[in-house]
A protein has these predicted regions:
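Signature of Asx- and small-polar-rich beta-strand/turn repeats characteristic
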Residues: 1-201
């Protein structure tokens, strides 16, 4: 039951353990883009993050959407852009933004969706919302080898199968500064039920 799971999660947090999250079904696709009729001629083609393919399942005709988590850019050679063996993931890409306030010590950064594949979370931090430069932060599951300037974030499961992101304290990992703007991209999926797709459009 949900109550039992939340009790287990609470105990796991006490020992610094995060249970395994849902895992998105994955596949790989290859395709080309013919730029012969495109003017002016592009030097490269970029596939933007988000939904890139759809498919019907082999059982019951269930449909699914597949996404990429990051932009992918390839060069155009002889009018052809080749996307080769791109990893795609079943589910929906969601973006959530937060603004850090050092006047709110109880502030929490909770991702509001369940069904998140935690291996596919992307976290970036800017000095402020209007800044143009984004620094990528990496997931860390322990405190070993961390310095005061390590660009890392930590993760813990909270109620209703959701996840909370938190950052360093200035000793173990870099501490956020007031008005830092946090962007989190993540994927919610159907887990194992996303398997069985083989043809994509």
């Amino acid at each position: 039951t949900a109550t039992l799971r939340e009790n287990v999660i609470a105990l796991a947090r006490n020992i610094g353990y995060t249970p395994r999250s849902r895992k998105a079904a994955t596949s790989a696709i290859s395709f080309i883009v013919d730029t012969t009729n495109i003017t002016p001629k592009p030097a490269s083609i970029t596939l933007r993050k988000g939904t890139v393919a759809a498919s019907n399942g082999v059982f019951g005709g269930t449909s699914g959407t597949f996404c990429i988590l990051d932009d992918i850019t390839v060069p155009v050679v002889d009018n052809i852009a080749t996307f080769n063996e791109i990893s795609i993931y079943e589910g929906t890409v969601i973006e959530k933004n937060f603004t850090y306030s050092d006047r709110n010590p109880q502030q929490k950064f909770v991702l509001p969706n369940s069904g998140i594949d935690t291996d596919l979370i992307r976290v970036g931090v800017k000095n402020s919302q209007s800044s143009t430069a984004t620094v990528k932060y990496a997931l860390q599951d322990n405190l070993f080898y961390l310095g005061s300037d390590s660009k890392v974030y930590f993760l813990q499961e909270v109620a209703d199968e959701r996840y909370e992101i938190f950052f360093g304290d200035g000793v173990f990992g870099q501490k956020l500064e007031d008005s830092n703007y946090i962007t989190v991209n993540y994927l919610t999926s159907h887990g194992d039920s996303g398997n069985g797709f083989s043809q994509f459009a």
